């Protein structure tokens, strides 16, 4: 083995042989036949550009070569900015983020905006931490059931509270949300 090391010393570069220039790495010099086959080979190798053979070149058609005027540009930009601003306002307000479930519609305030979580001024609890959305939904359902019972009692003050009537009122109230609004 020491004889092999002496004939090829470590760290000495070999000179390039003249047959490396025509080796397998030089595919440009390969004889591929006619020009069409050469172009196909280059295209398949990713080196050649395919010529456009379609009838319609993008941007050359008369209907697509319409340029906008300055007024149209301004109008389009204003519309886009207003749409962007509206979407950012609704996203930041968080009004549409809450999942309310099927058949639920928020009660409209006197100024036309829906009730947003955290804006209730008539709450009497002084809890410092805000409720999670799941807690507020379950609380709102129990509040709805209680308000339905109160409405039932207000409509029929002379009736004695019967557990059966109470159960019927709850089921009727729940059925209002189950039934489709489009009858």
UniProtKB/Swiss-Prot annotation:
Coiled-coil portions: none
Q: Which residues carry this modification: Phosphoserine?
A: 15, 17, 63, 87, 127, 147
Give the matching InterPro entries.
SMAP (IPR026714), SMAP_dom (IPR028124)
Please list the residues that carry the modification N6-acetyllysine.
174, 179
Bias class Acidic residues marks the residues at 106-149
Superkingdom as given in the UniProt entry: Eukaryota
Q: Which UniProt keywords apply?
A: Acetylation, Isopeptide bond, Phosphoprotein, Ubl conjugation
Q: Where is the composition biased (Basic and acidic residues)?
A: 48-78, 153-171
Cross-link position per record: Glycyl lysine isopeptide (Lys-Gly) (interchain with G-Cter in SUMO2): 13, 62, 75
- List the residue ranges of the region (Disordered): 1-183
Q: Which family does it belong to?
A: Belongs to the SMAP family.
Name recorded for this polypeptide = Small acidic protein
What species is this protein from? Answer: Homo sapiens (Human)
